[in-house]
Amino acid sequence: MSALHVSRVRALYRRILLLHRVLPPDLKDLGDRYVKDEFRRHKTAGSKEAERFLQEWEAYAAVLWQQANESRQNSTEKACFGISLPEEKLNDFRDEQIGQLQELMQEATKPNRQFNITESRKPKL
């Protein structure tokens, strides 16, 4: 791999992690783990697959950047992140990718327990 390619991958990786800072903490953690895993998994991808990988992640970063800006401008409304996947894109996925997407969806739609604090009736010593 060329130095230019490696530089492009690292810059994109850092940009995505920076963009994740605007997400709610649970989604940030989930997104960070997913990005790290995907970038690690594609370290040895062929040039054609690597280019497609980068294009998709650059599109993700662009959408997230736009949504973060909209969220800042409309601070009175609840922030909304993400987009629906068109059927054409889903048809391009391999079975393994569909499974990963399903796991990601289940993880992302779990009830938010971050602020679910229950008081213990037992005194702490």
From Swiss-Prot:
Domain of life of the organism encoding this protein: Eukaryota
Extent of the transit peptide: 1-30
Subcellular location: Mitochondrion matrix
Any one GO biological process: succinate metabolic process
Disulfide feature: none
Any one annotated GO CC term: mitochondrial matrix
Known partners and oligomeric status: Interacts with SDHB within an SDHA-SDHB subcomplex.
PANTHER family: DC11 ACN9 HOMOLOG, SUCCINATE DEHYDROGENASE ASSEMBLY FACTOR 3, MITOCHONDRIAL
Protein name in UniProt: Succinate dehydrogenase assembly factor 3, mitochondrial
Organism: Bos taurus
Primary gene name: SDHAF3
